[in-house]
Structures are given as C-alpha cells and as structure tokens.
Amino acid sequence: MLKVGGKGAISSLKAKTVFPLAATIEEIMRTIEGGKNVNELLAGMKRREGVSDEVEVSGEDTEFTKIKIGEFYSSKAVLFDVFIQLNSGKYIKILHAGDTFDQQRIDKYKNDKKIEYLWFKKTDRAKYLKYQAHLTTKIISSEKVPIEMKARFLKNVTSKYVEEVMSEGLKPQIIEQGKQICEQVFQLVDKEKNLAKLLRGYQEFDPTSVDHSYLVTLFTTSIIKQFEWQSQATIETASMACMFHDIGKMKMPERLLEVRPGDMSAEDLELYQNHPVLGAEMVDGNNLINNSVKQIIIQHHEYFDGTGFPFKKKGAKILTLANIIALVDDFVHIMVERKMKPTDALKFILMDPLKVARYNTIIVENFIKIFVEPEKMKIIIPTQ
C-alpha cells in the first residue's frame, strides 16, 4: 500500500479530521500511482524492493534544497535521494532513488529525533516539481480536502517552482510548468467558499524563503476575483506575473538581495529600482510569455500617486493588475517583516493615508473584501 509522508502537515487540524484526511490524501496518491506522469519520472530508474542502508555524505550546502518533513509526499518508488542535514556540509542519505518508500524511516527522524526538514539535491528539483504539481492538481480538485491543506500543497509547489526559475532561467519546459501552477491557483480562488477565512488567518510564511512569490500570488488573485471583469485568463496571467515579478533581481549584485531598500545607499537603491526593467528584458522576446505579463513585471512597483518606480507612472497610465501586485507586494513585506496577521497588516496600510494614496481606491476596496463579507464591512477607507 502506498504510504503517505505527511502526518505532520495535518497536525494543526482538529484531531477528528486527521485520519479521514490522511486516508483521502493516500487515496488520491494511489490514483496517480502508475499514471503517465509518474511513469515518466520512473523511466530508466533502477527500482529496488525494500530500503537501502543510510549513508553519510558530504556536499556543498548550495547543492541542496529543503522541505518540511511533515509536508513530504512520495510515490511508492522514491523518485530521488532524500537526506537529513547533520550540520553544514554533512548529510545522511535516508532514502535512495528507486527504493520502496519507507514511512517508518521518515517518522523515526520526525518524531524521535525531531528533525524539521528533509533535503534533496537541487538537480532533482524538476522531478519533485513534476510529481508535486500533478499531486497538487488532484488535491485542489478534491472536495474532501480542506482549503488549508490545498493552500499548503500549492505553497510548496509554487515556492520550489520559483526556486527553479531563479536557478535555471526561463526554459520552455519551466514556463509550461508555471502555466500548470497558474491553473491550480485559479482553481483554488475560484472554487473555494472558505477563501476569506484562509486569508484572514494565514500565518504560514517564511521570510527567508521564496514564499514571498506564493503569498503575492495568493492575495493578488484573491483581489482580482472581486472584480466583475475577472476571468480565468486574467487570473492565470496575473499568477504568472506574480511568480516572475522579481525575476530581474537575478541580475542585481548578490550583496543587495538580502538588503531592504530603506537600508540601501543612494547608489544601491538606484540599482535596486531598475530590477523591474531587468525583469522585463529577461522575458522580452519569449513567445511563451504574453505581453501582459511583461508589462506587469515592469510596472509592479509603480504607484497610483506617481511615487513609484522605475518610471514614476501615475493614475490610469498604470495597469490595474500591476497596481494590485504593487499593493500586495507591500502588504506581504509588512506582514512578514513585522510578523503581523494579514488583517493587522491591512489595517497598518489603511491607517496611513500616504500608503493608501499609492493604490487605486477600487483596488483597496476589493482588497478589504477578500477578508470580510461586504455586509459585515466596517473598515472605512481613508480619503486620498
């Protein structure tokens, strides 16, 4: 029977839901076992019954990427080598590619040794993404899986996807995989009745990871959903732009990547404020990325009052989708850096007229709507 590697991921749910949910996920995983997507990943892999011995290995930390141990899911045959980290440069390979997946070995490290993360080679990230994206599609379409779990699956696949883009660039197969994730985002925001509850209580963010792009995607598409002109194509276009919006930072000096704009010198700030232009240049000429995505990337820091960058566009000269992302980008930074709940970060923005002036009023109004039902709305938007 296929084992499920994610008990820890559902521990925050009420106890009575744990076992039915685990069974539901196991059932979903069983339906994709032996399917085309999994078989393609297993092609050419030497498979073994049972589990190989654990092996201590050395390697550069930059060669590895991590995932929370409670959120690791595997096919019956392990698709790639899986490690735990002993210390910098030292790892133990606890699962070997081709082995039969062993949940007990995972549980030993999670429960007995309190290990929080599993690691795998960045060269195997594409395999992880392909399997995880296929599984996420099934999870999101299931009526039995709660929205919190759906969002967790989507977060993991989006975060690792952005890592892959930043590492490997905009290769055709990577862009196509991004389109699949955009479809998943649409399905989540379009079908879920409990989306407002999820957004109000969302606290699963890590300021040291690429979760930023996922959070921007989730909140941006939720705002777009409030507009009468919203459509699947619009939401998927915005999702792609959200995942790529900071791609221009790949061309910035590495020393600036961990520095906030407020702490930069005038010279470094000028370099930073050019990253939307660099991002647009990177996707320019790529026929797999439509022009709307390119325009959003170059405008995602433009403000409605003309105080943004790189071109200080103002008012109607800014694309609505770009101004939405500008708002959400600011909101996510406030939420994460100040460790605020989403609703508190919203209030922080609304209490500052200078901040509110950066965004089209209708965007701010629709931002409020994603947290509360219109008839319950009591927040007054400051006048611009």
Regions found by a protein language model. Name each.
Residues 1-203, 207-208, 384:
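Non-catalytic interface/linker regions that flank or bridge core catalytic/transmembrane domains
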Residues 13, 112, 227, 286, ...:
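Acidic-histidine catalytic/liganding microenvironments
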Residues 137-273, 280-285, 291-292:
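Acidic/His-rich, divalent-metal-binding segments that scaffold phosphate/diphosphate chemistry
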Residues 238-242, 270, 283-325, 340, ...:
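Histidine/acidic-rich helix-loop-helix segments that form or flank divalent-metal centers
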Residues 248, 332-333:
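Short acidic, Gly/Ser-rich segments with clustered Asp/Glu that frequently serve as metal-coordination loops
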Residues 252-253, 306, 336:
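Active-site-flanking alpha-helical
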Residues 267-268, 278-279, 333, 345-348:
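Phosphate/pyrophosphate-binding active-site loops
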